[in-house]
Design a protein with these regions (language model features):
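Short connector loops/turns at beta-strand edges and beta->alpha or beta->beta junctions
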Residues: 1, 35-39, 92
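Amphipathic alpha-helical linker/stalk segments
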Residues: 1-23
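Amphipathic alpha-helical packing segments from all-alpha helical-bundle domains
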Residues: 2-5, 23-24, 28-35, 51-74, ...
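Regular secondary-structure segments
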Residues: 4, 8-11, 30, 87-98
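Short linear capping/connector segments at secondary-structure termini
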Residues: 9-13, 42-50
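Short coil/turn helix-boundary motifs
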Residues: 14-18, 36, 50, 75, ...
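Hydrophobic/aromatic-rich alpha-helical bundle segments in the mid-to-C-terminal region
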Residues: 41, 45, 54, 72-118, ...
Length: 124
């Protein structure tokens, strides 16, 4: 939907440094969850309870992960496991920010560090 478009445009507009691309991924993901509001954890739980909605969620996750893989490809071959770990961190940090447990900035900084570490592991 709309968030996917915003994310794609932000990635296209970002410079070619790893830090900037990773920063776009981190800030877009967290902001997307915060924009959708505090009901998101409940929505995610509801999505998981229905096979059709679970399939839709997986489809959107696959699109997001493909975009991330492509954006980070110049800096290293990121594994599917690494991308899944990043997504798990992104969800957990975004929900913690949405519930007020941590700040938006803390969520984005931690996610950025997670992405940078994932890419650096893929290089070795």
């Amino acid at each position: 939907g709309r968030q996917t478009q915003v994310f794609a445009e932000a990635l296209d507009a970002s410079s070619t440094t790893l830090e900037e691309r990773a920063g776009v991924i981190a800030s877009c993901y967290v902001d997307c969850v915060l924009l959708q509001g505090r009901e998101i954890p409940g929505v995610i739980a509801a999505l998981s309870s229905s096979p059709e909605l679970e399939a839709l969620k997986r489809k959107y996750e696959a699109i997001f992960l493909d975009k991330c893989r492509a954006a980070l490809a110049p800096f290293g071959q990121v594994s599917q496991a690494g991308l899944r770990a990043m997504l798990g961190a992104a969800e957990a940090l975004s929900h913690a920010a949405a519930s007020g447990e941590i700040s938006r900035e803390e969520a984005q900084q931690e996610l950025l560090a997670t992405i940078l570490a994932m890419v650096s592991r893929s290089r070795s």
